[in-house]
């Protein structure tokens, strides 16, 4: 891996680029000014990449010094737009309630644990509500969607989809992906189901539960899609009201309207549009809306980019080890 001057990286220098060969992806001209970098996760690493070219830069490396495999795996990543701080989840061991959430500066300095091991079971995709100063994430084996303050305090459980003890191993209850629509007060999340089992769900709840509702009784919950192969991560285009997601079952990136038609059946919706195919265990997805592009990652070590309609797809990294969450910042 190459390195950058920390001051340059913190200031966003080295990120002032336009995606090479894709200045007008989908026919939309790229806006002037510095373009965002990609930030993404390896098993025990936080990395960044200039999507116009160059090599990945490792910001944080928690790999065991003896070369052994990490006991926990990083999964969800988000960057606070105002502070530049990077937040990410680590799943810990799947059979133990030992997941945690970390934070560092944009250049990788000042690594801090803000949710200590066991504060969440197996935290997955992570998002920031900057207006409310809250972190939101899905908890896989914890079978829940949770949130906390930006310093890790005041952890709340918004919805519970199963009992981690009684339902252990029931992957249909595993919460994985997560996205936010703060303007309308909605949280979107996936339940992946078994491996390519056609049990996958995409659901929506309110950020604020209705009066009288509990985490185990969310009468406001809406199932938007069911019987998906194995949906993983989410992102939203709020302007066009479009939902994007990766699916590890058919190894795709897809999109569909956020607002389902009246009287719809989540099991038979026909408005899913597959945009990218052939990924190696698809995981992360992130939209760069001003530049009409998206990025995606896979457990097979891929970091790819494409226009929002899937055109112009190409790989930036094709052998990066096990890769998970991704975001632009």
Spans of model-derived segments:
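Short loop/turn segments immediately following the C-termini of beta-strands
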Residues: 41-43, 91-92, 140, 192-194, ...
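Structural motif
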Residues: 45-48, 96-102, 143-146, 196-203, ...
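An edge-strand/N-cap motif at the start of beta-rich repeat modules
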Residues: 30-57
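N-terminal export signals
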Residues: 2, 8-24
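A short beta-strand motif characteristic of beta-propeller blades
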Residues: 55-68, 110-116, 155-168, 219-225, ...
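Residue position within the beta-strands of beta-propeller blades
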Residues: 40, 88-89, 137, 189, ...
